[in-house]
């Protein structure tokens, strides 16, 4: 049996048309976007398709591994709040969860990927500059030598693909914008396809193998560049006869969000700080809303040509059967729901509902149909692609389990029966699960894009510091499901969405200990208490714009409780436990941002003198590695008075130096004492002249102060659980 070729065409940030899109925009889509129109006219369109996760980085491995973030591990997006090396970033790890590339490679396919990847940090780095190696200029001129370097390095090989040419089209530079890169991506792919088809015609055995091709385009993602592109002189996109009509504001633009989870209003009040001075950036958006919405739709036009050139090359080849998928990684809120932007801290349809279309070409072409009533998910891609290609999931799973540690049954559905217009009863009853833990603005340095651009990342001035969404939970999960009156009174056979906003200490900035809960002036704040769950409930048939949160409507109590149980079941069924846990790393602020109590200038001078003669010498070889899976115990004294009636205790630096050396390396540290409770600290050791810089940290560190007040009794300690036990000195220790 000859297996068909499989082609996946992706865009970035393209939402499905919302229900409030008017007739003029629908007409514009048909006229100006021929690539999308071709898929509509030749394939099966799933109008209720959901991403599975948000945002960019978590969504892509959800699509390409067929699993949710709690299994594949990728939960955070770099960009505004984090750079690629941020301690809180979690890129897909090799050798754990196989990608669709691995699945098809195991079946004998060639697997080729070109365009935006954004699942691992795959850029080649120039060792001299420390910057990604470019493959094109801002004018779109190709740097052939660097393209060759990427092809030779083959950075995606361990993730199941070849052919990728970086760097990621990500960031503010024009050279990495979709405006420049999408055409270059399309040109490379068309060249690759034409060569492949030509070699097949000549009987080349290697070329005759079926292939999986991913063509991953950027736009309409350039909408994130709007603050810089709002002025016409800075915008590379020129007016066109095919410009979209004026895009009206969404009907939820002015809702006050008072009935929604608190994270949404907190995110609204924090988002702009990711770019730069909050109030200034906010004004740019609010004064240019029409231009903002119009640009988003115009960017659909920019990428339609590159999509169509790939599509025409594939559909023009009549010798082979090909299955084409078209989708996007996520959508965009575009000012809906009270003025929310992008796709974080919500599961609204504008952010989670995206195009999903399947076309089969060849001897048995697909018949055009639109499926309106069945919810589908990104996790359905791999089962559907395998099913339509005639490949056995169980057989391939056994083969992959020899090479990967996290091979689990795929949670998605094979949608191929729907392509064949077979019985859809089973699909009508399904629940579609989705989740996100993407706390995008929370990173190590809390530096806005402008601060980083100006070289102020480690110590940004207050106006250029990111404000994290304050005092809210940052995890969301939800389901979309049809509920009958038999299931729950009030369901009415309608399609419902239930969303839970929840806190999870395992994901805190200091996991299990405390969470960064505010970074607004005058000081950073943490919390160590868990925020209660908050809920959203929407009837998607009667309220498709998700305006009325029905979670507290007593008339819908049965529907709410029924869906709560369904959500709990789906979460357990759809997200299996990892074989090898991957705990979250602790946030690591730069040294410049670590709070300290500075001594006054005279004391500072005397401290420097004492350091030169040997007190608290500087560590000339600081430890730089990570020891995240280790635990340490520091044992101190309870004895606070000498027999001669002088106060005593542990000399502070004997405790603070090992404590901060351990914690800065990622080690979890407990404090213990013979009796438990208050640890005695020699007051002389905390005087401005005699204390160390570690003591300066202690004096403003509420967490360590709490540990000092509530040390663990040695009688309650199991020493076997610790990798290091350190006995802190001090006169009082001799009395214990």
For each feature predicted by the language model, list its residue ranges.
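Catalytic-site neighborhoods of secreted/periplasmic enzymes
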Residues: 65-187, 191-208, 225-228, 428
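C-terminal, low-complexity/hydrophilic appendages and adjacent surface loops
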Residues: 349, 436-551
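Core domains of carbohydrate- and sulfate-ester-processing enzymes
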Residues: 47, 59-60, 107, 121-171, ...
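Active-site-proximal cap/lid insertion segments
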Residues: 13-29, 203-209, 217-375, 388-391, ...
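Extended, subdomain-level signal for the structured scaffold at the beginning of enzyme domains
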Residues: 591-735
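Active-site-proximal N-terminal segment of extracellular/periplasmic enzymes that hydrolyze or transfer
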Residues: 1-47, 533, 545, 550-556
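Substrate-binding rim/cap in mid-to-C-terminal beta-strand-loop elements of soluble/periplasmic
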Residues: 64, 162-175, 308, 343-425, ...
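Short, structured active-site-proximal loop/turn typified by the sulfatase FGly-forming signature C/S-X-P-X-R
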Residues: 20-60, 66-71, 110-111, 560, ...
